[in-house]
Amino acid sequence: MSKKGQTNHWKGEISMKKILILNGGPRMHNNTAKLLAAAGEGAVSAGASTETIDLYKLNFTDCRSCLACKNKRMAVPWKCYWRDGLTETLQKVYEADAIIIGSPIFFGEPTGVVRSFMVRSTFPALSYDDYQSTFPGKIDVAVILTMNADQNYYDKHYKSHMEEYFQPFHYLNGKTEILTSFDTLQVPDYSRYRMASWDEAKKKAHHAEQFPKDLQAAFELGRRLASRQ
């Protein structure tokens, strides 16, 4: 059997890359979801297979600190042993060549489900013997972030924090990169909400000009992940 994404010399074939797409936002059809869909289209265009999972539809918790993943009697030290609604998705993570996870920014942070997923998928691979990874494979990770903040605010207040925030994905032994979408359109009609601080006309004009560019950037991200050796 060939390894993921590598040539099967016995058959002379190349196995199809698997890319798992995870929506960490509560809306299934808004900015984050649209960018993830574009990334998936880019991956498929490069010959990869994709699957999309909405994390908000799963019933799971953050790490329970059971430390089963650190127990020497356990056969697979890099797997989370706590079984709940995330278990099946984690198995798909372990089998993927890359994952693309998207999240809006709430109060300067990704959503709670994204944080919980990140810990559950990476903490088991962290060895407390030498602080190296016990995971035997390599999974590249792309993070797509959407936010009301503009790029200047992000660069000043969020950028370095987000780069540090997603460091745990390095325990999956692949590359981690972040794609950002700024000043997003929250709702189609701002007059229905207590959002007077936002200029609806300005928001819509920015969205009409910028969001197609963001979708293209997401498409190229997916294509690049699927093409990476």
Give the location of each predicted region.
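N-terminal beta1-alpha1-beta2 submodule of the flavodoxin-like/Rossmannoid cofactor-binding fold
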Residues: 3-130, 195-229
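Short aromatic-enriched loop/helix-cap "lid" or pocket-rim segments at secondary-structure transitions
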Residues: 63-66, 155-156, 188-193
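Short, catalytically relevant binding-site loops at active-site mouths
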Residues: 106-108, 149-150, 185
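Short, glycine-/small-residue-rich phosphate/pyrophosphate-handling segment
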Residues: 112-113, 126-179
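Beta-strand-loop-alpha "switch" segments that mediate conformational coupling across diverse proteins
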Residues: 177-188
